[in-house]
Amino acid sequence: MNTDYIALAKAFLVKQRLCQTCGIVCNYGLSLALRKPLVHFYPPILMLEPTNICNLHCPLCLTGNGKLLRPKGMMSLSLFQKICREVQDKIGMLILWNQGEPFLNPDFYAMLEFAAKQKFYTMTSTNASLELNIERLVKSGLHKIIISMDGITAETYNKYRINGNFELVLKNMQDLVLMKEKLHSSKPYIVWQFLIMKHNENEIEEVQKMAKELKIDKLEFKTTQIYSSEDITFLPSNHKYSRYLQEGNIFTLKTKVKNRCRRLWTQPVINWDGEMNICCYDKNGSIKIGNIQEHSFSELWWGEKMQKMRKEVLINRAKYDICRNCGEGIVQKIKTVKSER
């Protein structure tokens, strides 16, 4: 049985967390049926941003291409601990990334260790193009790590991961697998994420072989998000690997933007400075909810601004730019390959 699923189940098999999760799922279903936002429970998931600073310059990332408008910084360990303590009995999963490279935060290992003591299920995403303390990482209690590497050669990888180090990323993945074996640890569950673009779509078959050889737990292929007609050149030639319909310089999502969004019921975001976002697609924090340093989580979660947003997406979600380019409801992970162990 998948050890990652077991770890996830354990995190939620706590009375209050389980009740909260079941309750909010029912709330969401009723909200869709009644077209009225009903929220009487906490979300099961919380995304926390350790930092919005990155060491790479990926051209389709707002942080990497310099178009992120928010102030840059790193979440303090004290703020992280404050948030965790406030929601530890209600929320089961912490997603520890947003706009930035989490391991650039010098307190990140301590954050992982603290979250483990609070019995959260934790997952993070990294470019792994920096020196990692592999032993401490495996011992930290982190449940899942997503490593982004979009190529099986340095030449392919460097076309998108500007300023990245292919050899270092590969070494970190290999060392992580070996350290897990050495310490007889099932954690963290290692996911190799491969963003499909025009320049690497020809490597899809080979990367599956490579992932199995490296004993990676799971390989995930993901579609690419673009923001302007200038970005179309990154889209793969094979349209089944794209989330967009394309006609010349015009691109639209393959699926209709429906008047619903589970993330507003299940997965809020708190940025490095304490500002709450409605979701991770609001990368610049354009929709202001409030700051966790000035309000409690419950005040923000059940506050007027969040309720107003929930009501509006049930009526006309397409009015928001971020929603019109959102992958919600689209199968973004085209294919997954699990390693045979």
Regions found by a protein language model. Give the residues of each.
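A short, charged
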Residues: 314-325
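Short, basic and Ser/Thr-rich N-terminal targeting/leader segments
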Residues: 44, 263-264, 319
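Small disulfide-bonded, cysteine-rich extracellular recognition modules and tandem repeats
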Residues: 22, 64, 264, 326-329
